[in-house]
Amino acid sequence: MQKFEKGFFVGAATAAHQVEGNNIHSDYWAQEQLPHTSFAEPSGIACDHYNRYEEDIRLLADAGLNAYRFSIEWARIEPEEGKFDPAEIEHYRKVIACCKAHGIEPVATLLHFTSPKWLIAMGGWEAESTVEYFKRYVSYVMEQLGSELSYVCTINEANMGLQLAAISKRFRLMAEQAAKAAASAGKSAEGSVQVGMNFQKMMENMKYAAAENAAVFGTPQPKIFVSERTPEGDLLVMRAHAAAREAIKAICPEVKVGLTLSLHDLQAQPGGEAFAAAAWEEEFTHYLPYIKEDDFLGVQNYTRTLYGAQGQLPAPQGAELTQMDYEFYPQALENVIRKVAADFKGDLIVTENGIATADDTRRVAFIEAALAGVQHCIADGIPVKGYFHWSLMDNFEWQKGYAMNFGLIAVNRETMERTPKPSLATLGGYANA
């Protein structure tokens, strides 16, 4: 094992809705309660991280890690439009202070998929007003907490909506062919987006969803952040990021600002070159004009995607698959970093990389291979400044519920007892104090 240089972030990541619990004012909480929800189960108290963050941060620090990426929940800070909750600001102030007390660098994400329910009722992530609402929220958070932070991610996986639009279109086309084809297609389609989605269940529930969503959000097709996005909505997200960056720099000019992107290692088989090139343009290249002023880019990668002469291909026959049906392919991270660095000349931080598996020996192997790739990139002069493993603990994987084991720490669903896995110590061993 080769340790990273001093100052390199070796950390773990979480998202508020997936770990905190009782995020009752959010759009996701509302969707989880629908009679015909696409969620396998509701988030409930999640991992109770809201009340147990001190224990979780201590476990992270005791293992040798030196950084923690977490998200600040907009729906807690602004549960009603224009009404901010100072008690929730104080909660996150305590989280940041706890990190620093344990020698942990706090890296805050201001939007990790979930939004306040009221925002979605006002048009959500296809409405121009959302840009100003987001800027106002970001300004409030930075006025209160900005002096205590050095790194801020504005938006997590800003490209997720376009990825979902492409995958949903492909899934619907395959599902129309036959029930048998739909079953197998559902597996491969879900494996090509880096978030837990139940596409088959979503299609089955469509006839009920419109009325139920209208009753909750005032619209039959709520534009939550993780939903199919139009090109106009894609640009709106970029404007929201730019507005947030401007607000952060005006209040705390020394804070380093960036966003994160979900990036696959897109590999072309003979005849698939045009498909792979088009996918990379949509997934990454067209965002370059909007992130050129950022201090860093958050790279989030879990696997590769193959393309042939007819388009996207399934994982190779006999390939090891994770619980998410992703191909076990840790070398994807190095490939993505190198491809990104060819066009983006700022600092890079791996803000997510991980594996869903009940076999922690495979997680250890994944970490070791992925970090070897990161070290190869650094040796070649690529400015990679940190690595955050997804995730600190087993948690709520969105529509898939609690069945996915992404964590470095196991969480007993009955007692909430934490049990560090060997992979946590493995990751900590790479950090230089």
Which ranges hold each PLM region?
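Active-site region of glycoside hydrolase catalytic domains
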Residues: 1-37, 81-82, 89-363, 372-433
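Active-site-adjacent substrate/metal-binding segments within catalytic domains
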Residues: 20-92
